[in-house]
Amino acid sequence: MSIIDTRTPEPKRFISGATGDWEVVIGMEVHAQVTSESKLFSGASTAFGAEPNSNVSLVDAAMPGMLPVINLECVRQAVRTGIGLNAQINLKSVFDRKNYFYPDLPQGYQISQFKQPIVGEGKIMISVGPDNKGQFEDVEIGIERLHLEQDAGKSMHDQHPTMSYVDLNRSGVALMEIVSKPDLRSSDEARAYLTKLRTIVRYLGTCDGNMDEGSMRADVNVSVHRPGGEFGTRCEIKNVNSIRFVGQAIEYEARRQIAILEDGGVIDQETRLFDPVKGETRSMRSKEEAHDYRYFPDPDLLPLEFNQAFVDALAAKLPELPDVKKQRLVETLGISVYDASILVTEKAIADYYEAVAEGRDGKAAANWVINDLLGALNKAGKDIEESPISPAQLGAIIDLIKEGTISGKIAKDLFEIVWNEGGDPKKLVEERGMKQVTDTGAIEKAVDDVIAANPDKVEQAKAKPTLAGWFVGQVMKAMGGKANPQAVNELVKSKLGIEE
C-alpha cells in the first residue's frame, strides 16, 4: 500500500431501486484531439476558431487521387500518451477504413484503427473522495486500448432555415480514442477518471483537454445489473463535453434503466444523447456493431512500424506525471494527500506551488495557494496563468508572517492589496504602516483598557476561560489588527489569571 492509498473496507455504493439494489457498470471512450500543428494525414492547420472551411486541404476534402501521408508528430504524441497510461506500446499497428455515410465525412469512411491499435492495454489509478471520514479510495481503472483516427467535420443546422451547412475544418484532425475497460462503478468514479485522464494528457502536452472547445469528448457506456449477476445491456451516451455532464448523464441513465427493468421491461442497446438543459438522455439511434462498419485495412496506408528505441527515446523525455509528483510533494514537503491531490490537478498549479514552497514551509505554502490564491482565482474566473500575484510575491507574504513582521490577519489584507494593485509586499508593509505591533508596553495598555471597560466579562472569563478569546478579539480590534496575536493572547490570560 502506497502513502497515497487510504482505501477503506466499505463496500461499493449501490443504487437503491424499488425492488432492491442495483450496480451500475460504466465504460468510457474518450476522444482526445492530438496536440499537433497539422492534421493526421495532411498538412492543413488544426487551429481552433478559424473561418469555416479555411483549414481544409485536398486530402481533407477527399478529392480524387489525393493520398494520405501519416503525420509523425501525431504518432509520437500517441506513444507518449500510451506510456503515460502505463500501457503496452505496439511496435506495429494498422490503419483501417471505418465505413459509414454522413455529410461531414467527405471520404465516405473514417481512417481509424480496429484490430491492431498503436497502444494496447494499460491502467491508471484514480482517487475517489474524500468520504465523510476525510479518506480517499484508490481505484485502478483498466485501459483497453488507444488508437489514432481522423475526426469528422461539423454539420451546422442553425445557419439557414431550410439548409444545413458543413464545416470541414475539423475533418482529418488527429484524435486519440482512449477506451477504458468497464471498471467504473459510479458517476463519482467516472468523473474522477475523466479528470485524471485530462490531467495526464495535459501534463504530457499531447492534448489541451479543453472540453468546451471539443478537443476532448466522452462517449459513456452505461448498464445496470443486480449485484453478483451478469452485466446488463449497455447504452452509449455520445459526445458528452464536460465532466459535470458526464456525472449527470450517468445518474439519469442508470435510473432510467432501473425503472424500465423494475417495470418488467427490457433495455434496448442503443445510442443516446444527453440534454444538459433537461438533465436527461434521449434516444438517437440503435447501437451499431463492428460488422456494421465493414472495417478493412486502408490500402493507401502501409502498416505503421517503429522500434523499441523510438519508444525508449520518447519515454526518456517525459515530464513528471501527476501520481509521481503527488507522492513526491507529500514525502518531501509534508503536505496532506488531499492538498497534494488539489495541487497536481493542473501542472501550472503544481509549478506555481513549488515555486512558492521553495525554501519555505510546505504546509503554509499549500494553505495560501489552495485557500487564498485558488479561491481568489475561482471567484475572479481566472486561470493560474492569469494570476495577478506571482509566486515570488506570495512567497514574500509568507516570509513576512514567519518573520513576525505582520500577523495572519494583516497578511490577508496585504494579499488583497497586492492582488488589486501589485507591488513588492515588503515595501507595501513599510509604506502603509502595516507592521504588527510587538511592543509589549503598547499591547499591555490596550489589554488593560479592554479589561477595565468590561468588568462583568472579567468575572465570567475566570469561570469560563474560553471567554479569553473575546478579550483577545477586542484588543486586536482596538489596535487595528496590528498587534501580535500571540503576545495579546498571553497578556490577556496573564491579566485574567487564567492558567495555560
UniProtKB/Swiss-Prot annotation:
Cysteine disulfide partners in this protein: none
Annotated keywords: ATP-binding, Ligase, Nucleotide-binding, Protein biosynthesis
Annotated signal sequence range: none
InterPro entries: Asn/Gln-tRNA_amidoTrfase_suB/E, Asn/Gln-tRNA_Trfase_suB/E_cat, Asn/Gln_amidotransferase, Asn/Gln_tRNA_amidoTrase-B-like, GatB, GatB_C_1, GatB_Yqey_C_2, Gln-tRNA_amidoTrfase_suB_CS
One GO BP annotation of this record: translation
EC number annotated for this UniProt entry: 6.3.5.-
Recorded GO MF terms: asparaginyl-tRNA synthase (glutamine-hydrolyzing) activity; ATP binding; glutaminyl-tRNA synthase (glutamine-hydrolyzing) activity
Statement: the UniProt record of this protein carries the keyword Protein biosynthesis: yes
Matches recorded under Pfam families: GatB_N, GatB_Yqey
Matching SMART domains: GatB_Yqey (SM00845)
Enzyme class: ligase
Catalytic activity: L-glutamyl-tRNA(Gln) + L-glutamine + ATP + H2O = L-glutaminyl-tRNA(Gln) + L-glutamate + ADP + phosphate + H(+); L-aspartyl-tRNA(Asn) + L-glutamine + ATP + H2O = L-asparaginyl-tRNA(Asn) + L-glutamate + ADP + phosphate + 2 H(+)
Annotated PANTHER family: GLUTAMYL-TRNA GLN AMIDOTRANSFERASE SUBUNIT B MITOCHONDRIAL AND PROKARYOTIC PET112-RELATED, GLUTAMYL-TRNA(GLN) AMIDOTRANSFERASE SUBUNIT B, MITOCHONDRIAL
UniProt family annotation: Belongs to the GatB/GatE family. GatB subfamily.
Subunit structure: Heterotrimer of A, B and C subunits.
Function according to Swiss-Prot or TrEMBL: Allows the formation of correctly charged Asn-tRNA(Asn) or Gln-tRNA(Gln) through the transamidation of misacylated Asp-tRNA(Asn) or Glu-tRNA(Gln) in organisms which lack either or both of asparaginyl-tRNA or glutaminyl-tRNA synthetases. The reaction takes place in the presence of glutamine and ATP through an activated phospho-Asp-tRNA(Asn) or phospho-Glu-tRNA(Gln).
Annotated protein name in UniProt: Aspartyl/glutamyl-tRNA(Asn/Gln) amidotransferase subunit B
Organism name: Brucella ovis (strain ATCC 25840 / 63/290 / NCTC 10512)
